[in-house]
């Protein structure tokens, strides 16, 4: 949801010290990170996923001591890959969380662009189920990536 991007000045309270920063570009991207702390994992997400991931990242840091740097592109095309590159060079681990089926997505494009730059990294891409979005609430919950799935994946990814 594009309205989520306007709340960058009022993020949730973070006991871990996470803050939003804007990139220095005309149409800026957001970076959610802790100042003076090297991240363990780079997470990329956008839209309606951002607020949920903000809460989840704080939990990962407070409960598991995993520091995540979240990059939130605001303009998907043309994509400004530079903030992602800068983060990946530090972490070597990319976790993409997207509300889309797994084939031909922005997450796939991000991975392809990074590989074309010959950057060495490991990547995990979490997507919705590869099916039609159901109208039933119960089936819809099985369709989308859950916060618990993202949490568990990030925790396992950190240990690799």
Question: Where do the language-model regions lie?
Answer:
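Thiamine diphosphate
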Residues: 1-160
């Amino acid at each position: 949801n594009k309205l989520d991007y306007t709340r960058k000045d009022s993020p949730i309270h973070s006991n871990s010290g996470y803050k939003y920063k804007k990139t220095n570009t005309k149409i800026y991207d957001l970076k959610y990170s802790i100042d003076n702390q090297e991240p363990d994992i780079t997470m990329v997400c956008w839209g309606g996923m951002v607020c949920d991931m903000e809460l989840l990242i704080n939990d990962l840091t407070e409960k598991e001591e995993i520091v995540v740097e979240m990059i939130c592109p605001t303009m998907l095309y043309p994509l400004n890959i530079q903030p992602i590159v800068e983060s990946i060079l530090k972490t070597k681990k990319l976790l993409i969380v997207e509300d889309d089926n797994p084939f031909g997505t922005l997450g796939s494009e991000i991975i392809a662009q990074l590989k074309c730059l010959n950057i060495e990294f490991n990547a995990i891409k979490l997507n919705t189920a590869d099916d039609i979005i159901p109208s039933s609430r119960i089936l819809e919950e099985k369709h989308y990536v859950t916060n618990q799935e993202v949490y568990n994946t990030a925790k396992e990814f950190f240990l690799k």
